[in-house]
Amino acid sequence: MERVFSVEEISDPFWVPPPPPQSAAAAQQQGGGGVASGGGGGVAGGGGGGNAMNRCPSEWYFQKFLEEAVLDSPVPNPSPRAEAGGIRGAGGVVPVDVKQPQLSAAAAAAATTSAVVDPVEYNAMLKQKLEKDLAAVAMWRASGTVPPERPGAGSSLLNADVSHIGAPNSIGGNATPVQNMLSGPSGGSGSQLVQNVDVLVKQPTSSSSREQSDDDDMEGEAETTGTARPADQRLQRRKQSNRESARRSRSRKAAHLNELEAQVSQLRVENSSLLRRLADVNQKYNDAAVDNRVLKADVETLRAKVKMAEDSVKRVTGMNALFPAASDMSSLSMPFNSSPSEATSDAAVPIQDDPNNYFATNNDIGGNNNYMPDIPSSAQEDEDFVNGALAAGKIGRTASLQRVASLEHLQKRMCGGPASSGSTS
């Protein structure tokens, strides 16, 4: 924020030291000439430059105030440097074009008569003019564009006003510096003039600075709100678009999550069904393993039974091998007594297929025949033989029965021979 400095805050080295004081007589003699030279120089300087810039009302008021203050000073002292110079401020010497109208003899007379006016009324008039000038300056500042900060801002009100004029509207022509006008009189008059200006400007300057700061704040807020509205609108649109995009992304994520959850539930159902099937297969495998062991045991049992059957068959086949030898022996002992009764008995001998009858007669033969070897027999062997014979389907049963019948006939004849001979004798 721009700060306006009062003239009282300016240090003494910025002002040009006043020339040594002169005597009162010389000052009175040179009073009229100083005013004329000052005014004439100003007019000449103003008229010399054809392209002089237009003055604002505040500058004219300030120029008139300085002229009246110089005319009101008791001891005016013209300076040879009255037409070349400027106000020395914080930023350097600022040349000010003091454009004054040509003073005629009537103006000089009016100036001399104005010095006789009552000082109190004149001070009140000056104060009123100063207030008007300050109000005009404040309005001019409020209407113009003021930069936020100026590093090289002037320390006095005049320096601030001149700095707002700008570089393009440069002062042309032979301008009459105000500093030389202030330093032209004696040292006491120059310092008193600066002090009077400080006293008159101090209070209004502070109030005008406050008004200026408030105006600047208001303008800054207006500019900020005016420029921030599009930015706020863009920001709101961006926020809205971000919210919508975030909402869409959340909806997409929720849909994807629901789909994944459905897939997970389906896979869990499939996994449970596969686990049940695996359990069933394992149970069947265990049952099959048990059945396999049972079947292996049955196979071993059957193998043992087959082996026993083979052994029994071998024994039976070995006994059958002896039957041909017995038939051979019967054929060798053919000369027996042939009686009709024996012949009829031999012819009437029935041939039975019952093997039990065969074994019964065989036992009798074994008990009475001393020529035949004893054939051991047992119920188990008989059973095995019968089972083997039945399993064989009675193959070759006719031949064996014929041999058995011939063997029985032979045994009967052998057994009946001694008995018949004993009875006959």
UniProtKB/Swiss-Prot annotation:
Residues 260-274 are annotated as: Leucine-zipper. Residues 1-50, 169-257, 334-354 are annotated as: Disordered. Residues 234-253 are annotated as: Basic motif. InterPro entries: Basic_leucine-zipper_C (IPR020983), bZIP (IPR004827), bZIP_plant_GBF1 (IPR045314), bZIP_sf (IPR046347). GO terms for cellular component: nucleus. Residues 231-247 have a biased composition (Basic and acidic residues). This is bZIP transcription factor RISBZ2. It comes from Oryza sativa subsp. japonica.
